[in-house]
């Protein structure tokens, strides 16, 4: 029995919607397939929440040990004493912008150890 593609197509053209629906269901059952179009799965969290590779380190509060926080800010930023004090006194303020994840975590840990409150953005 040879398949004649043109005859099959002609038969499909003349079939009703209900007959074509039954045909699709029969093919799905017979071959264990589905006629549903493949759907692209969105990345977890969507594109807006992709894993960030750089962060801004923001000093939200200097806490009780302002002198220690100023020393750490000077060490991290290379600012002079006056500039570092102004940054700490002006909290919330950006300490560093666009730093790598590991460096941002390290800076956050140093500042928190000195008594500051820090957020990564």
Curated annotation (Swiss-Prot):
Q: Which domain of life is it from?
A: Bacteria
InterPro entries linked: Ribosomal_bL12, Ribosomal_bL12_C, Ribosomal_bL12_C/ClpS-like, Ribosomal_bL12_oligo, Ribosomal_bL12_oligo_N_sf
| Keyword Ribosomal protein set for record | yes
Q: Which UniProt keywords apply?
A: Ribonucleoprotein, Ribosomal protein
Q: Pfam families, per this entry? A: Ribosomal_L12 (PF00542), Ribosomal_L12_N (PF16320)
Question: One GO term of the cellular component aspect?
Answer: cytosolic large ribosomal subunit
- SUPFAM superfamilies according to UniProt: ClpS-like, Ribosomal protein L7/12, oligomerisation (N-terminal) domain
* Molecular function per GO: mRNA binding; structural constituent of ribosome
GO terms classed as biological process: translation
What the entry lists under NCBIfam families is as follows:
L12
**Subunit and partners:** Homodimer. Part of the ribosomal stalk of the 50S ribosomal subunit. Forms a multimeric L10(L12)X complex, where L10 forms an elongated spine to which 2 to 4 L12 dimers bind in a sequential fashion. Binds GTP-bound translation factors.
| Role of this protein | Forms part of the ribosomal stalk which helps the ribosome interact with GTP-bound translation factors. Is thus essential for accurate translation.
Which family does the UniProt entry place this protein in?
Answer: Belongs to the bacterial ribosomal protein bL12 family.
Q: What is this protein called?
A: Large ribosomal subunit protein bL12
* Species whose genome carries this gene: Streptococcus suis (strain 05ZYH33)
Gene behind the chain: rplL
